[in-house]
Amino acid sequence: MISQDKNYSDDQISQDSEIDTIEAVSETEAVSETNEIIDMRDDRIQKLEVELVQAQQRERDLLLRSKAEIENMRRRNEIEVEKVYKFSLERFVSELLPVIDNLERALEMSDKSSQNLASTIEGIELTLKSLLNVVQKFGIKVVSETHVPFNPDIHQAMTILESEEHEPNHVIIVMQKGYLLNGRLIRPAMVTVSKTKS
């Protein structure tokens, strides 16, 4: 019976040993699977953290771009409003220029030696001076200088005269004054330009 008990015990030990081995393998596999799951979750967490950082960066970039675009639009609108303000008088000034020209012509053609016309001439001079002061307050600049280089941006050459007294390509006579409104040409000055004698 002892031998049977021994065999039984050996079988029991063997089975227990197999069970322990199976349990150990199962535990190892379970730990391994758990570690794999944890590793997969860690990888997923890291991936999600990277995606989160990228999404936050995209949001910051989008916010900065939006702010910059709003600032650019605000600046463009300010510039546009300023242009509208500066040049809103352009049409009015264009209509006013012939009046100024007529007053200047009236002064040129008047007989300044006549005592009868002295007060009329003085009235025209004061009216012209007052009118020019008003238009200058609104950014109107007269282009009427002579002995300056010809500038096609503000001058319109009507004639060319040979002259030894003047430098070539210079304005020697202004036939009709030109006008600028805040730097923008309203009407070019009609001028005579010098050239060297051939």
Curated annotation (Swiss-Prot):
Q: What's a single GO CC term here?
A: cytosol
Q: Where in the cell is it found?
A: Cytoplasm
**What's one GO BP annotation on this UniProt entry?**
protein folding
Keywords, in A-Z order: Chaperone, Cytoplasm, Stress response
Coiled-coil residue spans: none
User: Molecular function (GO) terms listed?
Assistant: adenyl-nucleotide exchange factor activity; protein homodimerization activity; protein-folding chaperone binding; unfolded protein binding
One Pfam family, short name please?
GrpE
CDD domains in the record, alphabetically?
GrpE (cd00446)
Function statement: Participates actively in the response to hyperosmotic and heat shock by preventing the aggregation of stress-denatured proteins, in association with DnaK and GrpE. It is the nucleotide exchange factor for DnaK and may function as a thermosensor. Unfolded proteins bind initially to DnaJ; upon interaction with the DnaJ-bound protein, DnaK hydrolyzes its bound ATP, resulting in the formation of a stable complex. GrpE releases ADP from DnaK; ATP binding to DnaK triggers the release of the substrate protein, thus completing the reaction cycle.
Q: Which family does it belong to?
A: Belongs to the GrpE family.
Check the record and name the HAMAP family matching this protein.
GrpE (MF_01151)
Please name the PANTHER family in this protein's record: GRPE PROTEIN (PTHR21237), GRPE PROTEIN HOMOLOG, MITOCHONDRIAL (PTHR21237:SF23)
Assembly with partners or alone: Homodimer.
Q: Any idea what this protein is called?
A: Protein GrpE
Q: What species is this protein from?
A: Baumannia cicadellinicola subsp. Homalodisca coagulata
